[in-house]
């Protein structure tokens, strides 16, 4: 599994040849990972859509599913992304896991569930249609500029939050579908 944590990689992607075109993160990822393994799978460009969250949890048991349905890391919170899976012919032994309890278990307030302006996270699901519809309105501009308000409300790893150009790029990509 290959991914990134926090916003630091954005300046690298933005300065790369892919940084000025459409889908810079996906194109940069494909270029950088090409040739590192016998094959590479990506979480974008499907179908087929591969079970990246399941693979990530197997590789790193400290990852847990947050109330928002995305993986939370005990140090980086919701501010990490899975970019690719490297496939090798030979079996590679993983280092011993460092399982830790999910930080969500001890979070009584669950601000992530209360902060979404359209209540898109409820009943154990995510109302993607309501979220995207809201983003297309003037009221949705704070989310488009600052990033997902529910993710920003999570106290875990807040210092690693995506900000500025990266947050805006990711929100535009999500809003487009």
Protein language model regions, located:
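Non-ligating segments of multi-cofactor redox enzymes
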Residues: 1-177
């Amino acid at each position: 599994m290959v991914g990134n944590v926090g916003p630091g990689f954005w300046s690298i992607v933005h300065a790369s040849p892919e940084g000025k075109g459409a889908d810079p993160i996906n194109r940069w990822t494909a270029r950088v990972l090409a040739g590192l393994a016998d094959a590479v799978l990506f979480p974008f460009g499907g179908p087929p859509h591969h079970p990246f969250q399941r693979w990530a949890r197997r590789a790193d048991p400290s990852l847990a599913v947050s109330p928002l349905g995305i993986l939370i890391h005990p140090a980086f919170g919701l501010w990490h992304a899975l970019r690719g899976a490297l496939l090798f012919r030979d079996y590679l032994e993983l280092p011993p896991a460092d399982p830790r309890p999910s930080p969500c278990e001890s979070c009584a307030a669950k601000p992530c569930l209360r902060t979404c302006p359209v209540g898109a996270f409820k009943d154990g699901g995510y109302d993607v249609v309501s979220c995207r519809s809201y983003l297309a309105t003037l009221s949705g501009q704070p989310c488009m500029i600052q990033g997902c308000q529910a993710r920003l409300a999570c106290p875990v790893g807040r210092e690693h939050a995506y900000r500025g150009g990266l947050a805006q790029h990711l929100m535009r990509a999500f809003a487009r579908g």
